[in-house]
Amino acid sequence: MANINLDAFDKIIALDFGSQYNQLITRRLRDFGIYSELLSHKLTADEIKEINPKGIIFSGGPNSVYDPNAFKVDPEIFKLGIPILGICYGMQLMSYDLGGKVEKADNSEYGRADIEVLDDEAVLLKGLPKKQYVWMSHGDLVTQAPAGFEVTATSKNCPIASIADNDRKFYGVQFHPEVRNSEYGLDILRRFAFDVCGAKANWTMDDFIDMQIDEIRKEVGDKKVILGLSGGVDSSVTAVLIHKAIGDQLTCIFVDHGLLRKNEADQVMDALSRDLGVNIIKVDAADRFLGKLEGVTDPEQKRKIIGKEFIEVFNEEAKKIKDADFLAQGTLYTDVIESGTDTAQTIKSHHNVGGLPKKLGFKLIEPLRKLFKDETRELGEKLGIPHELVWRQPFPGPGLGIRVIGEITPEKLEIVRESDAILREEIKKAGLDEEIWQYFTVLPGIRSVGVMGDGRTYDYAVAIRAVTSIDGMTADFAKIPWDILQKISVRIVNEVDHVNRILYDVTSKPPSTIEYE
């Protein structure tokens, strides 16, 4: 599977107990230059010893430690001599297992809270302000710290907000230092990682590239690899990385289903094939896809048709490539976490490659499976992929097919494609393109009366969707300046045929999703 050998890097592992913030723990540590993975809480002490981490973090979670079905940890872990930091549920679990008391709180704490540092010399809190705000999310609390622990911070509703056992290097915080809403949370994590664990910041993207290229060469040998290229960031970076490792032994199949953004297919071919030398077979299948989608209005049915047709087209082309033993995919670490931990729900398969390895008998190569999205973008730039391609907007697998509400027709696709291009152009001109997390146009499927010149019109409305977010889990609508919105509106109505009204979506996520379908 072209998995990188991580023995060369200092590691801090996080055990997953189900917190919505658990991915942030590993993200923060990697930002410090320390390699980190989120692993199952079911790992045994022997398995952890084999990993040889510099430190262990117990994540937060939704359970109560005194519940018989609560997530537990191998008690032998506490005997390994490895520093441990418990966060929220993790602090409660460590306290409970080591003889402390955990009870239901009289007043739960969710959101911002103020804590007071009780010990100015506490390892994780030394030199930080005595009063600071943090992010709490708990309904239980530690009411008695275990023997050997000192209480180092308190809050109004949580008398034991932080604990420390310096002899065993066990620490706990009831709040979430991994969340940016905790004022000095990153400082606390840094102190645990560097001062307590003694980890070195030796996780670099250059090392990752060299080691991953070596791993790919060893695994593939003289065999051939095929890759389903969507034109998105993940598959593009995967393609260039594998190409650097094995050259023309890689063949990418780029299925243009006619649902891409304006000029997107040409941009991908120019950047990857012409400029970087990646071997790409481009299949123009727009008529085929649109024929299958004719008359279909249900969004889930549209997704299934697009996914099924993609697999069939890919399958037809893949069979033409002789001696191909491997299929490459742009799986990221977030996908691995979401589908592979005991506490997570299974995610949907990617529409264009789900089932292909089994269907065609390929071995799987996933060279990005250890990377987060931002690391993938960094890797892409180091590999020489153009900045605008690496930092392009998130785009759904079914493409514009789910930005046309109702039946998809060539006319409707053209309206969305052209209006979206105008929106992206004006947002970039205004310098907002890296400030707004995602922005696009949608054809909601409604028509309205309008007046153009001296005549009455009955044409389509176009909706603009623009959101700010960190990770896409939650989002707020972007406050685009009115003059910019006006310019976008005027251009779309004047330059795109059959449009006489522009709508601006001012809904957050939740209750809405970012995409309409």
From Swiss-Prot:
SUPFAM superfamilies, per the entry: Adenine nucleotide alpha hydrolases-like, Class I glutamine amidotransferase-like, GMP synthetase C-terminal dimerisation domain
EC identifiers of the protein: 6.3.5.2
Entry annotation: catalytic residues: 88, 176, 178
Pathway assigned to this chain's UniProt record: Purine metabolism; GMP biosynthesis; GMP from XMP (L-Gln route): step 1/1
Database matches in InterPro entries: Class_I_gatase-like, GATASE, GMP_synth_C, GMP_synth_GATase, GMP_synthase, GMPS_ATP_PPase_dom, NAD/GMP_synthase, Rossmann-like_a/b/a_fold
GMPS ATP-PPase domain span: 203-392
Pfam families the UniProt entry points to: GATase, GMP_synt_C, NAD_synthase
Top EC class, one word: ligase
Start and end residues of each Glutamine amidotransferase type-1 domain: 11-202
CDD domains attached to this UniProt entry: GATase1_GMP_Synthase, GMP_synthase_C
A single Gene Ontology CC term: cytosol
Catalyzed chemical reaction(s): XMP + L-glutamine + ATP + H2O = GMP + L-glutamate + AMP + diphosphate + 2 H(+)
Positions that bind ATP: 230-236
Intrachain S-S bonds: none
Organism domain of life: Bacteria
Coiled-coil intervals, chain numbering: none
Keyword ATP-binding: yes
Record key words, sorted: ATP-binding, Glutamine amidotransferase, GMP biosynthesis, Ligase, Nucleotide-binding, Purine biosynthesis
PANTHER family, A to Z: GMP SYNTHASE [GLUTAMINE-HYDROLYZING], GMP SYNTHASE-RELATED
Function: Catalyzes the synthesis of GMP from XMP.
Subunit organization: Homodimer.
Protein name stated in the entry: GMP synthase [glutamine-hydrolyzing]
Species of the source: Limosilactobacillus reuteri (strain DSM 20016) (Lactobacillus reuteri)
Lineage of the organism: Bacteria, Bacillati, Bacillota, Bacilli, Lactobacillales
